[in-house]
Amino acid sequence: MLATSMSLLAQGTSWQTATLISNGQTKTGTLDNNNTVAWYKITVTQEGHVDLVATSTGTLTLSTGSTVYGLKNDATYSRGTFTGATGTYSDVNISYHATDVGKGTYYIRIARYGGAGSFTLKYTFTPCALSNDPEPNNDYQSSSQLQSGATVQGRLGHRTSDDVTDTEDWYKIVVPEEGHIEFRAISTENLLLSTNGSVVYGFRNNATYSRGSFSGNGTYSDDTITYQATNVGKGTYYVRISRYGGSGGYKLYYKFTPCPLAADPEPNNNFENAGWLPSGPTKQGRLGYRTSDDVTDTEDWYRFTVTKKGAIEFTVTGTEDLTLSTYGTAIYGLNDNGTTYWIANFSGTNTYSNVTLTYQANDVEKGTYYVKISRYGGSGGYRLTYTGPTLTGDVDGNGKVSISDVTDMIDRLLGSSNPSFAIDDADVDGDGKITIGDVTALIDILLSGN
């Protein structure tokens, strides 16, 4: 009689008095006509699987109506019933298995179907094989940052004891310059990831907006989903990984690859901010990239100086999938009132757009001009080369380059507060102004024998 009383005290008679079972532990209880149910509880500290196995002795058979409960709003709710090894309604061996168990306390009611005797209840918890993501991260405000080249792990689809299922995780990336981004998410166990629900977002006007969803072999879901974009500009982007069904862990890989060509000096989207374009060297720039706040760079402006009347030539070539506009890419002059006027468009083999555009003109007067490089479609880098009239370094105008030209240039620089810019060939280094750099360039010409 004493043993029976101690057993009843150990097994609990309601969810409020349920006996705690630890992972890996087995508890013993007794059921008969007077004691038809026994209550236990488990505390789950992370996402994973729960296995419960009850085995009876004597004439006792256990009901498959034995149930696992969660607790929400101060009341229990069913998380599922046990199943029998052979019997539909009762058995001497019943079990419960769940793979989507989240954190919290759960309550277990073992119910008698018939007979009397003792039983054992064994509890086993197996954590999700992949580590958890840093919760909370269920919105963009609480997103954690990803680093290029790194893989993070997370979990989705697990349901807490108070009935909350983790259906999405948010991350963010900071893109420092124009380039490509790539994501790959791979799920484990029975977790399926949503293709339409997994999305990359930009941020404008204090709100997120879609920059595109992931894709997979399945239309709506897959265990492997990917996202790629080649036109990504600077800024912070947000990534939502969304569950379609099931539960388990996932691995998320992120990589950023910068545009292989150097960026042009922004801002240079109008003639007032035009960058300097010297004769000879090739400039690199980028077009077609869309920033996180939804601004696409569609044109770049440069300023160049023709220091003596003669021929000029331009070549611009796009890379990756960037195509350049023939009608938008043009040469401009500057009116006396400070506005530009159109001179001529570039040309290419196609009517509207080309990868390579060119412009040539003869007998161009001295002065400052502007060139606008305009995108037609795509994104990528470009190479721009300008070749102006040949600068001989004949500063004194005697028909040859000698030490007297060096002396003349130094005298002009030191002896005048306003050295003449009208002297042909004085701007030897081609930077649009006469400085000590031109003296150095002129000496280089003499030393080279040219």
Cite the ranges covered by each PLM segment.
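Predominantly extracellular/luminal regions of secreted and cell-surface proteins
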Residues: 9-23, 126-151, 257-282
